[in-house]
């Protein structure tokens, strides 16, 4: 039997961050858990919240680190080890400043683009070679600090679009699990 895939939604814990741009990964992970009909439980060895199940006929471990974004790797790496998931079978769902708001892109490896959550995961795993579901939040307006921008709630014009974007990102994640990176890229990047 094939080892599971590890699907991690990045975000920050706590109600203060729940509706911020930086928490899109958590929002999509919550949606995927709902599709599985399961509730997150704390994984004792890693401290992350996890759900196990099947997406697109594939065994998956869905996780949300319970630490702050810039420390995500300290919970993701132990999960990968516990479930014997190599980095290439890790999918990280995260917000992306370098994509227009609502745009979804799939990627394998590469740089972190200033994303501290990705940096932490790559450092803890010792490699950048893992899959990513990138969800565009766009660049901040004017000279606003990106670190401030990602921790703000979505703007009034953005807010109504967030549920649809999360649905599309969840669909993209399931497609990635089902058919693999290149075929999924061909379909998702045409949306």
Swiss-Prot record:
Molecular function GO terms recorded: peptidyl-tRNA hydrolase activity; tRNA binding
Catalytic reaction list: an N-acyl-L-alpha-aminoacyl-tRNA + H2O = an N-acyl-L-amino acid + a tRNA + H(+)
Alphabetically ordered keywords of this record: Cytoplasm, Hydrolase, RNA-binding, tRNA-binding
Sites annotated Discriminates between blocked and unblocked aminoacyl-tRNA: 12
Enzyme Commission number(s) of this protein: 3.1.1.29
Residues the record marks as site: Stabilizes the basic form of H active site to accept a proton: 95
CDD domains on file: PTH
Biological processes per GO annotation: protein quality control for misfolded or incompletely synthesized proteins; rescue of stalled ribosome
Broad class of the protein's primary localization: cytoplasm
Pfam families according to UniProt: Pept_tRNA_hydro
Binding site for tRNA: 17, 68, 70, 116
UniProt GO cellular component terms: cytoplasm
Localization, UniProt: Cytoplasm
Stretches of the chain forming a coiled coil according to its record: none
Active site as annotated: 22 (proton acceptor)
Transmembrane segments: none
PANTHER family (alphabetical): PEPTIDYL-TRNA HYDROLASE
Family to which the UniProt record says this protein belongs: Belongs to the PTH family.
Role of this protein: Hydrolyzes ribosome-free peptidyl-tRNAs (with 1 or more amino acids incorporated), which drop off the ribosome during protein synthesis, or as a result of ribosome stalling.
Assembly behavior: Monomer.
NCBIfam families xref list: pth (TIGR00447)
Protein name, as recorded: Peptidyl-tRNA hydrolase
């Amino acid at each position: 039997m094939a080892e599971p895939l590890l699907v991690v939604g990045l975000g920050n814990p706590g109600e203060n961050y729940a509706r911020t741009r930086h928490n899109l990964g958590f929002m999509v992970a919550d949606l995927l858990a709902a599709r599985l009909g399961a509730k997150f439980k704390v994984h004792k060895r890693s401290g992350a919240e996890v759900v196990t199940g099947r997406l697109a006929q594939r065994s998956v471990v869905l996780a949300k680190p319970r630490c702050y974004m810039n420390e995500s790797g300290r919970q993701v790496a132990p999960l990968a080890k516990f479930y014997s998931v190599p980095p290439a079978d890790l999918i990280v769902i995260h917000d992306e400043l370098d994509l227009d708001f609502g745009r979804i892109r799939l990627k394998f490896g590469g740089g972190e683009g200033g994303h501290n959550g990705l940096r932490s995961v790559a450092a803890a795993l010792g490699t950048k070679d893992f899959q990513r579901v990138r969800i565009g939040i766009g660049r901040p307006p004017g000279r606003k600090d990106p670190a401030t921008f990602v921790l703000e709630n979505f703007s009034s014009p953005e807010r109504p679009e967030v549920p649809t974007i999360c649905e599309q990102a969840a669909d993209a994640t399931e497609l990635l699990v089902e058919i693999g990176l290149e075929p999924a890229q061909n379909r998702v990047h045409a949306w």
